[in-house]
Regions:
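Short Gly/aromatic-enriched secondary-structure transition segments
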Residues: 22-24
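Hydrophobic pocket/interface hotspot
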Residues: 19-20, 29, 45, 87
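Conserved GNAT-fold acetyl-CoA-binding loop/helix
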Residues: 29-49
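Short loop/turn motifs at secondary-structure junctions and domain boundaries
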Residues: 51-57, 142
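Acyl-donor (CoA/ACP) binding surface of acyl/acetyltransferases
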Residues: 1-16, 26, 60, 64-156
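Short, P/G- and charge-enriched loop/turn segments at secondary-structure junctions
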Residues: 48-51, 75
């Protein structure tokens, strides 16, 4: 079996590592992520994983290349009633940025969403200045449907 192939597989507790936590605390990696607003620890990620692995409305995949965990792709807010979900993703290992891995990983996740879950619509959110993410989405057939100006979020 070839080791140098890109794999997407469901995340397991054993995938949790100090590298993963380091990625989440790296301001460059999380520049466009809501994860950037808090400090992450192994404990906080164990709690996060516990919730994700129990969830009926989310599928969290690890991105692996040469058996190295590079990042994650999540199909979240899955609605079988409305046949849609959101896709979220990140590559934590910066050495693998700009190599097409993000685009290929999203493609694999879309295959699961459309062919296994039988969803009809997948959506993603990205910042207008996150050109790399927009490029990855466009490569996978996404179109801009709208722009949220003056977006505010209530923080309790």
């Amino acid at each position: 079996m070839k080791k140098n192939i890109l794999k997407l597989r469901r995340i397991k507790y054993t995938d949790l590592s100090s590298d993963w936590v380091r990625w989440l605390n790296d301001k460059v990696v999380t520049k466009y992520s809501e994860k950037r607003f808090k400090r992450h620890t192994i404990k906080s990620q164990k709690d996060f994983l516990r919730d994700k692995l129990k969830s009926k409305s989310s599928l969290l995949f690890g991105i692996f290349f040469s058996d190295k965990h590079l990042g994650n792709v999540e199909l979240s807010d899955i609605s079988q009633i409305h046949k849609h979900c959101e896709i979220r993703y990140f590559i934590g290992k910066k050495d693998y940025w700009n190599k097409g891995i993000g685009a290929k990983s999203i493609n694999k996740a879309l295959n699961v969403a459309f062919n296994k879950l039988k969803l009809k619509k997948i959506y993603a959110f990205t910042y207008s200045n996150n050109l790399a993410s927009q490029k990855v989405l466009k490569k996978n057939g996404f179109n801009i449907e709208g722009k949220m100006d003056n977006f505010f979020q209530y923080k309790n």
